[in-house]
């Protein structure tokens, strides 16, 4: 039987096209650390330069009114991974409450042993929770952790590759060696991408860089851009760190373009919590991080993909970082676990229908013996519906109208008790429908 060679050529071309059409997208998750929601070029900041993020944001679907589930890094990051709220994960604070007199930084062997035991206990809940990273790995993705990570060894949580070791006996807490990414090197990302490409394997990158987080020590060439236009040194140094973060994002994009991978890569961006620099103290916040204020809980969120996502800017619709796990799995063609209550960020009409977001605000340190008590260590719970914002604290309730008062400065609770009651009912219902997963 004589077979026409042209037939083989046609078949190879067809199979190649089919493979390209059905190939899984790569995902790069850009996660900044301690950044104010206005502090980007694409959010119209008059001075801060973020050209690389601007290009990504303007090419994708951008939600100007994104919110975190907690204005503190560890619980916020846990929500990103699990698609659950802090009161569901038992991941509410950064560190455990230590017995009186014991110090985690002590060189005393007893203190070191106690600290290690408590950190292991503190990070244990994450092992039993759903995780979009675990799900990606089980669906054939190579997964890289860089930067901040609080939950012990990332390899135990679905990462095939990790910079962080997470061992408290070796100084592991919130990222250890991983915190070198961006500030000292980008090579682990370059090497990971190159390995995945050689294996023809789809990949996910967790870029949890320790920027613009303090220390605000960006290179002098960046500080020079702001020292004469910022209102004070604290702000100038923070702004320089923001630009530094943007530069590192540009390096990732450039490498993906160099390797021909950019068009098949989805970019997702958010920040872990907000930041407003204290004017008289470098590296310290005011009325932002760890607080239920807009400068503490608001962040832009965007999803960008050259192939499938049309450029669009949403100035009104509410988005939450609880939506990110669901979105990443959906864009990869994977059904999210049923416990994830977030929506797909690519469906703005669904987010518009929801029209509300919720936030847990707990103390920095958690008493590990009191995790069954959802009110222990509670500073506030927040619901935002449309432009109305209720902050419920153990001592009272505050009501803000964010359209006319975007910095939540004017408490209107005394003037509109009916609205306070409506939003309070929504908070109660939220807690009832999102119980802890233990």
Give the ranges of each region predicted by the language model.
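Histidine-centered active-site microenvironments of extracellular/periplasmic hydrolases
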Residues: 48, 255-310, 320
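A long, amphipathic alpha-helix that forms part
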Residues: 186-193, 224-265, 308, 331, ...
């Amino acid at each position: 039987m004589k077979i026409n060679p042209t037939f083989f050529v046609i078949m190879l071309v067809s199979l190649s096209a089919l493979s390209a059409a059905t190939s899984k997208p790569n995902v790069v998750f850009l996660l900044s650390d301690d950044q104010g929601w206005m502090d980007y070029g694409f959010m119209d900041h008059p001075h801060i330069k973020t050209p690389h993020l601007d290009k990504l944001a303007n090419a994708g679907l951008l939600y100007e009114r994104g919110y975190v589930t907690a204005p503190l890094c560890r619980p916020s990051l846990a929500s990103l991974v699990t698609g659950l709220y802090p009161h569901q994960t038992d991941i509410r604070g950064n560190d455990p409450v230590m017995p009186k007199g014991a110090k985690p930084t002590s060189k005393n062997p007893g203190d070191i042993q106690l600290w290690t035991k408590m950190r292991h206990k503190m990070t244990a809940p994450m092992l039993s929770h759903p995780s979009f990273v675990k799900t990606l790995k089980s669906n054939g993705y190579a997964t890289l952790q860089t930067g901040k990570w609080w939950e012990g060894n990332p390899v135990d949580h679905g990462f095939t590759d990790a910079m962080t070791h997470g061992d408290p006996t070796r100084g592991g807490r919130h990222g250890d060696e991983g915190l070198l990414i961006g500030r000292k090197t980008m090579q682990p990302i370059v090497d990971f991408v190159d390995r995945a490409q050689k294996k023809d394997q789809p990949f996910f990158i967790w870029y949890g860089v320790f920027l613009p987080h303090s220390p605000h020590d960006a290179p002098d060439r960046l500080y020079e851009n702001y020292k004469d236009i910022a209102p004070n040194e604290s702000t100038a140094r923070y702004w320089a760190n923001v630009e530094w973060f943007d530069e590192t994002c540009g390096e990732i994009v450039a490498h993906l373009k160099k390797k021909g991978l950019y068009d098949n890569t989805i970019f997702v961006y958010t920040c872990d919590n907000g930041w407003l620099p204290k004017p008289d103290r470098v590296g310290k916040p005011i009325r932002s991080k760890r607080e239920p204020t807009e400068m503490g809980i608001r962040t832009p969120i965007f999803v960008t993909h050259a192939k499938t996502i049309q450029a669009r800017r949403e100035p009104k619709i509410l988005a939450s970082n609880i939506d990110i796990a669901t979105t990443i799995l959906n864009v990869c063609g994977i059904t999210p676990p049923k416990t994830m209550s977030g929506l797909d960020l690519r469906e703005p009409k669904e987010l518009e229908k929801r029209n509300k977001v919720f936030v847990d605000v707990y103390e920095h340190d958690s008493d590990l013996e009191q995790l069954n008590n959802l009110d222990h260590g509670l500073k506030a719970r927040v619901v935002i519906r449309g432009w109305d914002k209720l902050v419920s604290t153990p001592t009272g309730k505050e009501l803000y109208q964010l359209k006319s008062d975007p910095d939540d400065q004017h408490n209107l609770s005394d003037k509109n008790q009916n609205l306070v009651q409506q939003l309070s009912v929504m908070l109660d219902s939220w807690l009832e429908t999102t119980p802890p997963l233990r």
